[in-house]
Amino acid sequence: MTLDEVTCGMAVRVGMIEEKEVRVQALRLGLMEGELVMCTANVWAGAIVLEHGGQEVAIGRKLAERIRVWPVWHSRGER
């Protein structure tokens, strides 16, 4: 799954980011491969807001579409 597909309350682990330009942009936002992040908002046709390291960061949808993630858990008890 990709980052743009996560739902609010979902925790995911950032997967391998193959494209160099995407990896650089993600690093600028503090996202590294293997990092655990929580989605706090997924605005339809807008940004995905993530919480990690005690901070919130908004990721543009175009960038989020290019970052693969692995679901860890959901605040509603889903896996």
Which stretches of residues belong to each language-model region?
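Compact, glycine-rich, soluble single-domain proteins
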Residues: 1-79
